[in-house]
Amino acid sequence: MTDHFDANVSRQIRLETEFWDNDPFERPGSDSLENILNKGVEASIFAEIIGQFAVQLAAAKNIVEVSGGQGWASCIVKRIYPAAHVTLTDAVPSAIAGHGIWERVFNCALDQAFAAPAQSISLPDGTVDLVFCYAAAHHFVDHEAALAEARRILKPGGWCLWLYEPTSSRLLHRAAEARVNRKRPDVHEHVLIPSVVLGQARAAGFNGTVRYWPSTLRRGRVESLYYLGLSFFPALCSILPCTAHFALQRER
C-alpha cells in the first residue's frame, strides 16, 4: 500500500471529490429518487454481467469492490452471495457515505466500507479472493499502480475483474476518446486499449483475457444499431470501439 500518488491520480481524486460533495442527486444526504432510478437501470446491466463470472464469484469468500461509489454494485454482490465478506472502497469519503441507501434498497448489509483509491487499499497482503470494479477502471489514470495494488491484496490465483469498460484498438483510440468526450465534456473520459491493459496486467503478475460485450442494454437508437451490428460480427469488436470485461487472474 502506498499513500504517494501520481499527480494525475491526485487531480482525479480532487475532481471526483468535488462531484460527490456537490452533485444534487448523489451528494451525502440527498437520497434522491433520480439517483435510485438511474442506478436501477445500471443494476440490471451489472446483474447480467456478473452472471458471466458466476464461477469466480461463487468461489470467492472475500470480495472487494474498488471505485465503487455509493456501493450499489457491492450490495448486489452481497445479496446474491450473502456468505461472502464484501468490502466497498472508493477514493472519496462522501461517495462511501451513501452506501446505506443501497443496503436498504437491496436488503443487505455490507461487511466493510471505507475510503481508499484503487492504488492504495488498506488491506493486508494476500487476503482477498476477488477484486472488481464496474465501469470505473477507465478513470483510474494510473492503471499500473491499480493493478499492482490489486495483485498485492489478492491471494495467489485470485481474480481481478474490470467490468463494462469502454475499449478500442490502438488504431482508432484517438477517435474513440474524442467521441466519448464530446458526449460528456465536463468529465474527461478515457478509453482502454485491451492490448495495453493486458500487457500491464502481465507485468503486474496476472494472466488475463478480454471479453468483448457488445450489449444493446441502455443504448440510444443509433448506439443500439451499432452494438447489434457488432454482435453479428464479433471479429470487429477487437478493432472498433466496444464495451468489454477484463478477467485477470493473479499468478500462483
Placement of each model-derived feature along the sequence:
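A C-terminal cap/extension of S-adenosyl-L-methionine-dependent methyltransferases
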Residues: 5, 28-31, 106, 175-180, ...
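A short glycine-rich, Lys/Arg-flanked "PGG" loop and its adjoining helix->strand segment in the class I
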Residues: 144-156
